[in-house]
Structure formats: structure tokens, C-alpha cells
Amino acid sequence: MKHMYIFLCLLLLSGVVSADVSGTALISDGDTITISGMKVRLNGIDTPERDQTCRKAGVTWKCGYKATETLRGWLDTKEVRCLGDIKDRYGRLIADCFVDGYNLNAKLVYEGLALAYRKYSKKYIPEEDKARAAKRGLWAGEFVAPWDWRKGKRLDPDY
């Protein structure tokens, strides 16, 4: 019994959970939502940060804002269901989320508003390949990958 208790404690400390959370979502940014008080990070994708800018045909646009507001528009007051089994270091559930029968994570990548976050998952690479080929969203111009942007990298200002 003692060994079982230790195992369960270690399992809980490791961030492993199994969650199915549903409800209307509050949007934090393009890849983070809150449902019923639980913060959810969309699995396997990374959207531009809220204040990140990109460039298309020489014109700067707010790609982070666009990702956030597009997600807000898709979700509005709809029921969102998220399925995940781990939490990240910030305590957010890492999950695949669904609304109206489609996978939000996949849709954001397919529309070119998010990148497949290969460091953590290969799941959405096919959607990214399609967005790149069709030059949708971010792929229509220049951008810095969100993970590089968070490290301080920016678009060349002398474009």
C-alpha cells in the first residue's frame, strides 16, 4: 500500500492528468483559453504572441492580434470541449479542443494563424504544409516563429 501511495504522489507531481473539460471559453491569446476556471494551452501549436507583428507585401500587420481575435470569433458563446492528459510548467492543461465538430488546433494551423509546434508534437505538420502551400495567413508574407519572437528575434526593420 505504501508503494502505491508513493506512486500516486509521484504521478500527481509529474503533471500527468486526464481531463475532459467543456463549456464556453474565455480567450487569453491565440493558443490559450480558460474553461470553467481551467487554463488550457492548445496542444501541438503555437500562435504569434498578442502584440507580435508580421509583414505581407511590405505592410506590417498585427498577426498575434489576428490569431487571438479569430479564435474569439470562432468560439464566441459556443460550447468548447478540450481533451488533455498533461499540464505544463504553468499549470495549464495541454489539450486538443473541439467546437462544432472540428479540431480548433488543426483549424488554426490550417488557416495559417498558428504553426505546428514541432518541439512538442508532430500532429499538425500536415495542416501547416497545406497552409504554407496555399500561402494562407502567416505564410502569405514574412514572420518570426513565435518561439523565436519570445526570445527577442524580430523582423528585419530595413525591409
Where are the predicted features?
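Small beta-barrel nucleic-acid-binding modules, primarily SNase/OB-fold domains
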Residues: K2-Y5, L13-Y159
